[in-house]
Amino acid sequence: MVFWIAGAVGLAIAYLLGSTPSGYLAGKLIRGIDIREHGSKSTGATNVLRTLGKWPALVVLLVDVLKGVGAVVFARWFYSWFSTLSSGMPPTALDLQSLEPWAVCLTGLAVLLGHGRSVWLNFTGGKSVAAGLGVLLAMSWPVGLGAAMVFGVALAISRIVSLSSMLAALTAIALVCGLEQPLPYRLLVIAGGIYVIARHRTNIRRLLAGTEPRLGKVA
């Protein structure tokens, strides 16, 4: 029972970390606006770039990436700490060491959900791309680096952030399935990639219609 309660607390902390609305706070602090009422209505770094400028967008991007990194680092620390703590408790049928990848998987999903559906913003938010990159880099840096490189190349060619983000998500799925990664990590990347792409439904419709704005243009 203690194990499941501790796990639920850890997931709640990861969700709240992801829910920290960095883009929304940037809009309020810099211009006193609700960024959800401007541009693409998203709180992500791309809309911050279009609405507030380059430097606020860079700060928001870094903060969102660090949210993903922090969630995975926290999950590993919390799990290690709890495993040490539970060593003095009566033995259980659970193999705590083998469950660590699952803890990382669920924590990664929690931070992505928090970023895209923030409890502080009536369950609105960003597209979870930057937070997802942070999760990838902390969980398996080769997968994260590969996804980031594809994003950079696609953005340089197309100048379309949404397209580049979805290609990066698909790349992450391909890499995590092609490389030797634990099953929970594979499931996390597949579920997270599908979630990120699903968050781009409106962008997909605009891409098909040829109306998706390129970087530097107003949404």
Swiss-Prot record:
Main location per the UniProt record: membrane
Localization annotation: Cell inner membrane
Membrane topology value: Multi-pass membrane protein
Pathway participation: Lipid metabolism; phospholipid metabolism
Classification via InterPro entries: G3P_acylTferase_PlsY (IPR003811)
Reaction(s) catalysed (UniProt annotation): an acyl phosphate + sn-glycerol 3-phosphate = a 1-acyl-sn-glycero-3-phosphate + phosphate
GO CC terms, sorted: plasma membrane
Keyword Chaperone: no
GO biological process: phospholipid biosynthetic process
Family: Belongs to the PlsY family.
UniProt subunit comment: Probably interacts with PlsX.
Function summary: Catalyzes the transfer of an acyl group from acyl-phosphate (acyl-PO(4)) to glycerol-3-phosphate (G3P) to form lysophosphatidic acid (LPA). This enzyme utilizes acyl-phosphate as fatty acyl donor, but not acyl-CoA or acyl-ACP.
Protein's name according to its UniProt entry: Glycerol-3-phosphate acyltransferase 2
